[in-house]
């Protein structure tokens, strides 16, 4: 990765850069997309107006899906030292009573479901990961002043910090430039939603003065506040800014001491990192694509922080968009594949916004009615155990489920009956948001009442596939994705997934760079007679694959590079499913040039690890 502070490059007053994909913004989403494209051999240039990666903490929560994406680009092991797994969220009354604790203990996707992390260090891991790719360039201190599109690509005009001009020509452009996105505004894409009236002041400190693990949401009616333990001895406090207060006033030593005294006995012995006031927003772009320009992360959606889903939703965008962009720029798939990005991601981003708003309604209601609703909701926990389990086990979290796009599901229109219309009208109230969120679970009673019976609601198609530990033929026990890599995969349980495969289907799968996998009970792995050439055999160490396949009528699953289930079938139907999938992908004819999707490298170079360690030392020391 060419360095952005190269003195020769800095001396140029006018420069033209050519790339397959230009990414505006070197935040976590832009850097993640760049890593994914870098693994696929795609030429990428990242333009960032700041002179370096932001070095102050913002997001503090990382979920299992996001960690799985880090794994897909070979960076999970480098990130793990900067995370705290099993980071529970506890809701506490003003008297100190814990009335609810979100502590999911499952790991179906291979990682802890709730993790604390230090975002600047995670961003540094992503940036250092780009050193693996000479075809990926990051240009700091480069502000985009405009861009134009034509049928062949995007031309971007930018200014560097030395007063020079840069022209970037790319086939596609991704706007990952934050909530105040210049790209989105220039495209004139509506950013629909609302801004909450309350502000919050965030205070990050070193040498944790409390030390207790987890995150505590104190529902104090006088001033709600948050206390969160973070890795490397850092703690975050968040206090609601009350009407009439300002950041300047609250930042005065005596006022800050009064705030901190609520949680720390001696405010004079607190080692501050920074203080910052922010406002909660809940907004969603009307589309994530305009011709050859795509929006991702905060440029496409912003949400309140209460479930830590802003960062994670952006990483999901990167995972969904990365492999599709790679296929299109490599001329393997047609441009229509990129239309599935909005179709798949926008609905789930909206659900995560609703989830974040509901969490805010519970923790910090902004009206007397909201407080009464919250208190009534909490009281049901003690009399309705099922309600408490639903909350504690995070069953309320909307998991991505793609009903359109690159999935082999029959098209079905949602039913919008009386209940649906009632929820739409009450959607901006606390009860309306909660019920609307619960109705997204289509298999639930409320989901059926609102949207009607969905024959495919229990189907795994369109959902993320599990990631258990498996044994390889060489005897290693690894996570499933470490075997599959970032490529298409067909997994058959107990039978050869290539049996009866037509020559055309086999050729199509080879062009996709896909692999064939035979999963079997672990004790059968040493028997090789049932494993044909070109098929990867894995042992089901934990029994989770057997359990998963026992719940569905089919025994073969087609997986996308982002590990979502594209389709399910019997061994006799694999050829037909591959043909259907090719149509969903807008796969180009065989005579077109094609490049296989690569298996990710497992780790960054040693010098990159050293760079991350150095940043960690700075973050915890100064």
From Swiss-Prot:
Which cofactors does the annotated protein need, by name?
FAD
User: Quick one: which residues bind FAD?
Assistant: 20-49, 288-298
State the superkingdom.
Bacteria
Name assigned to this protein? 3-(3-hydroxy-phenyl)propionate/3-hydroxycinnamic acid hydroxylase
Q: Which family does it belong to?
A: Belongs to the PheA/TfdB FAD monooxygenase family.
Enzyme class, broadest EC rank: oxidoreductase
**Cysteines joined through disulfide linkages:** none
Pfam families noted in UniProt: FAD_binding_3 (PF01494)
Q: Name the InterPro entries for this protein.
A: 3-HPP/3HCI_hydroxylase, FAD-bd, FAD/NAD-bd_sf, PheA/TfdB_FAD_monoxygenase
Recall the GO molecular function terms of this protein's record: 3-(3-hydroxyphenyl)propionate hydroxylase activity; FAD binding
BP-aspect Gene Ontology terms:
3-(3-hydroxy)phenylpropionate catabolic process; 3-phenylpropionate catabolic process
Its taxonomic placement starts with: Bacteria, Pseudomonadati, Pseudomonadota, Betaproteobacteria, Burkholderiales
Keyword annotations from UniProtKB, A to Z: Aromatic hydrocarbons catabolism, FAD, Flavoprotein, NAD, Oxidoreductase
Listed SUPFAM superfamilies: FAD/NAD(P)-binding domain
Q: What is this protein's function per UniProt?
A: Catalyzes the insertion of one atom of molecular oxygen into position 2 of the phenyl ring of 3-(3-hydroxyphenyl)propionate (3-HPP) and hydroxycinnamic acid (3HCI).
Pathway assignment: Aromatic compound metabolism; 3-phenylpropanoate degradation
What is the catalytic activity of this protein?
3-(3-hydroxyphenyl)propanoate + NADH + O2 + H(+) = 3-(2,3-dihydroxyphenyl)propanoate + NAD(+) + H2O; (2E)-3-(3-hydroxyphenyl)prop-2-enoate + NADH + O2 + H(+) = (2E)-3-(2,3-dihydroxyphenyl)prop-2-enoate + NAD(+) + H2O
Record EC number: 1.14.13.127
Gene3D superfamilies linked to this entry: 3.30.70.2450, FAD/NAD(P)-binding domain
């Amino acid at each position: 990765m060419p360095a952005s502070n190269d003195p020769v490059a800095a001396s140029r007053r006018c420069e033209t850069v050519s790339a397959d994909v230009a990414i505006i913004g070197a935040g976590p989403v832009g850097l993640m997309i760049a890593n994914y494209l870098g693994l696929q051999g795609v030429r990428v240039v990242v333009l960032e107006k700041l002179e370096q990666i932001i070095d102050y903490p913002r997001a503090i929560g990382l979920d299992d899906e996001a960690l799985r994406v880090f794994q897909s680009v070979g960076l999970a092991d480098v990130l793990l030292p900067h995370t705290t797994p099993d980071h529970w969220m506890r809701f506490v009354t003003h008297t100190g009573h814990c009335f609810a604790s979100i502590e999911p203990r499952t790991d179906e996707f291979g990682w802890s479901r709730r993790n604390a992390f230090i975002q600047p260090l995670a961003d540094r891991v992503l940036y250092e990961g780009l050193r693996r790719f000479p075809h990926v360039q990051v240009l700091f201190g480069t502000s985009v002043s405009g861009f134009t599109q034509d049928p062949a690509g995007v031309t971007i005009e930018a200014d560097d910090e030395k007063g020079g001009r840069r022209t970037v020509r790319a086939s596609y452009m991704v706007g990952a430039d934050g909530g105040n996105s210049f790209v989105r505004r220039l495209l004139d894409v509506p950013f629909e939603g609302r801004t909450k009236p309350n502000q919050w002041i965030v205070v990050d400190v070193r040498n944790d003065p409390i030390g207790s693990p987890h995150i505590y949401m104190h529902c104090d009616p006088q001033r709600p506040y948050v206390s969160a333990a973070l890795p490397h001895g850092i703690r975050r406090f968040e206090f609601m800014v009350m009407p009439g207060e300002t950041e300047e006033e609250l930042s005065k030593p005596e006022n800050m001491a009064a705030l901190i005294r609520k949680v720390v006995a001696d405010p004079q012995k607190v080692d501050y990192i920074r203080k910052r006031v922010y406002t909660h927003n809940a907004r969603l772009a009307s589309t994530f694509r305009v011709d050859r320009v795509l929006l991702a992360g905060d440029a496409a959606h912003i949400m309140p922080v209460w479930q830590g889903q802003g960062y994670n939703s952006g990483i999901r965008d990167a995972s969904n968009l990365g492999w599709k962009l790679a296929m299109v720029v490599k001329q393997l798939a047609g441009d229509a594949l990129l239309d599935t990005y909005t179709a798949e991601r926008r609905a789930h981003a909206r659900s995560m916004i609703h989830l974040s708003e509901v969490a805010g309604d519970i923790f910090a209601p902004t009206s007397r009615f909201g407080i009464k609703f919250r208190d009534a909701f909490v009281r049901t926990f003690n009399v309705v155990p099922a309600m408490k389990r639903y909350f504690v086990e995070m069953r309320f979290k909307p998991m991505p489920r793609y009903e359109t796009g690159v999935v082999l599901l029959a098209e079905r229109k949602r039913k919008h009956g009386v209940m649906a219309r009632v929820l739409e009208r009450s959607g901006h109230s606390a009860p309306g948001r909660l019920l609307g969120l619960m109705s997204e679970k289509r298999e639930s009673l409320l989901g059926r009442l609102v949207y009607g019976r969905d024959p495919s609601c229990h189907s795994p198609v369109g959902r993320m596939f599990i990631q258990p530990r498996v044994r390889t033929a060489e005897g290693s026990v690894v996570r499933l994705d470490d075997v599959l890599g970032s490529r298409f995969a067909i997994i058959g349980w107990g039978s050869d997934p290539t049996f009866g495969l037509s020559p055309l289907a086999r050729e199509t799968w080879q062009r996709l760079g896909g692999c064939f996998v035979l999963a079997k009970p672990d004790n059968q792995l040493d028997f090789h007679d049932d494993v044909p050439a070109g098929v990867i055999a894995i042992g089901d160490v934990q029994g989770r694959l057997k359990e998963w396949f026992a719940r569905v009528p089919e025994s073969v699953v087609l997986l996308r590079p982002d590990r979502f289930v594209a389709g399910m079938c019997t061994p006799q139907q694999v050829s037909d499913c591959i043909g259907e999938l090719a149509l969903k992908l807008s796969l180009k004819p065989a005579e077109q040039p094609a490049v296989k999707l690569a298996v990710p490298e497992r780790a960054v170079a040693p010098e990159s690890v050293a760079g991350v360690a150095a940043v960690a030392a700075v973050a915890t020391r100064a």
